[in-house]
Design a protein with these regions (language model features):
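Short, glycine/acidic-rich hinge or "gate" loops at secondary-structure transitions
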Residues: 1-9, 44-55, 167
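C-terminal helix-coil-helix/basic helical segment that borders enzyme active sites and/or dimer interfaces
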Residues: 1-29, 125-139, 158, 162
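Alpha-helix capping/hinge segments and adjacent helical runs
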Residues: 15-99, 172-176
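Charged, amphipathic alpha-helical oligomerization/scaffolding segments
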Residues: 27, 31-38, 113-116, 120-123, ...
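Long, polar/charge-rich, low-hydrophobicity segments
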Residues: 48, 119, 126, 169-172
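Long, amphipathic alpha-helical stalk/connector segments used for oligomerization, subunit docking
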Residues: 86, 92-135
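Extended, well-ordered alpha-helical segments in internal regulatory regions
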Residues: 146-165
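Conserved small/polar residues in nucleotide/adenosyl-binding loops
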Residues: 179-181
């Protein structure tokens, strides 16, 4: 098949989505690995000590989830890749776009909770970046990245729930389980 040149609008759209992919990839890899590890760990706990030693499916799942972090890069490497999107305001800008998207009336409470969390996240980012202290930023980097990730994922779940009731319960459980920042 013959490729055609992109129109200026298509190039601009491609550039926008390439930037989003660059920003969201470390969030997806880091948070996905952490969620997998936590779920596998919880699975093993129901079996007590034998969950580590016997041939339960959770033993394999635990090994697989641990190795995922190695294949994808450790969570700390993902934080290093993501922190620049925190400090440049890229995540906050995207969060603000999500805040302005309409949601189903029954999900407005979740959206408001996420808006409140985003406001506190923005205050934390401002306080830490204005300190101009690299050690402080390094110390807080993982927390800031996780805050952004939870808010973004919450908004994405609320958007999905607005489009289909199939996702409403998941959005409720996820957003309401977040510690209110």
């Amino acid at each position: 098949s013959k490729e055609r040149k992109l129109t200026p609008e298509e190039r601009a759209e491609q550039k926008t989505f390439a930037k989003l992919a660059d920003a969201f990839t470390p969030l997806g890899k880091g948070m996905g690995s952490e969620f997998a590890n936590q779920n596998a760990y919880d699975c093993i706990q129901i079996h007590g000590g034998s969950g580590f030693m016997k041939d339960y499916a959770c033993e394999r799942i635990y090994r697989d989830s641990r190795i995922t972090s190695i294949y994808e890069g450790t969570t700390q490497l993902q934080v290093v890749a993501a922190i620049r999107y925190v400090t440049t305001g890229a995540y906050l800008a995207r969060i603000q776009e999500y805040e302005n998207m309409p949601v189903a009336p029954e999900l407005e409470g979740l959206q408001n909770r996420l808006k409140s969390m985003a406001s506190k996240y923005a205050a934390c980012v401002t306080q830490i970046t204005e300190a101009k202290d690299q050690e402080l930023l390094d110390f807080c980097a993982r927390r800031l990245v996780e805050m952004a990730a939870h808010i973004i994922m919450g908004h994405l779940m609320v958007q999905d729930a607005s489009k289909s009731d199939l996702f409403s319960e998941s959005a409720q459980v996820y957003v309401l389980s977040l510690i209110h920042i």
